[in-house]
Amino acid sequence: MANYGFVIDNRTCIGCHACTVACKSEHDVPLGVNRTHVKYIEKGIFPDSTREFSVHRCNHCEDAPCTTICPTTALFNRSDGIVDFDDERCIGCKSCMQACPYDALYIDPNKGTAAKCNYCAHRVENSFEPACVIVCPVEAIISGDLEDPNSKISQLVMNEDTMVRKAEKNTDPNLFYINGSNEMLDPNATNYDGNYFCLLYTSDAADEGLGV
């Protein structure tokens, strides 16, 4: 049985938001909320400054706290590793949002129910890759079967120095980062010390500016 996951290669991500736009288009995600978003970190002092990017979304955890706490089983672990949701069962109680350590869930303002990245399950079931993977111009998002030792994603996880977000939560996430850092992966690590600036493009204004 497959066990699907993602690798985000921070060495190549250029922060173009193609993944965010593709996800919104694929799933009709409303303004003001995102299933996937890009985090920016500015480091240094101009002109010796740098900008780093990192894509954040549902981690598709094997031990997902959102599925455990959901009172209606609207969120559930599939046998292929994808954490999916059924908005017809959701009652909008926001328990999943409180339980998720990755801030991956939101309430759809049009439906009043929880939503998040579901690995484009409808595409995967028809042998297509998730929309974000297809559109990334630098192939910074890699998807695939973690149980297949010959898959690209398995090779990257085995051979590269990968990190996961909030490993101390013991959620066993299926989302791995290459060239990650505490500042990129943990919002609590970005306490301002004058050397970097964190920016998340998740607001209504940012969405409108991007035309998404």
Task: Give a label for each model feature.
Residues G112-A121:
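Solvent-exposed, charged amphipathic helical/linker segments at domain boundaries
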Residues I45-C61, M97-A104, H122-I134, E160-G180:
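Short Fe-S-cluster ligation motifs
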Residues Y201-A206:
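Conserved small/polar residues in nucleotide/adenosyl-binding loops
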Residues N3-D9, S25, V33-C58, A74, ...:
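Sequence context of c-type cytochrome heme-c attachment sites
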Residues D84, I91, Y192-G194, L199-L200:
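Flexible coil/turn and secondary-structure edge motifs
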Residues N10, A18-K39, D63-R89, S95-G112, ...:
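Iron-sulfur cluster-binding cysteine motifs and their immediate structural context
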Residues C66-T67, L175-F197:
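Short flanking/linker segments adjacent to small metal-binding domains or redox-active Cys/His motifs
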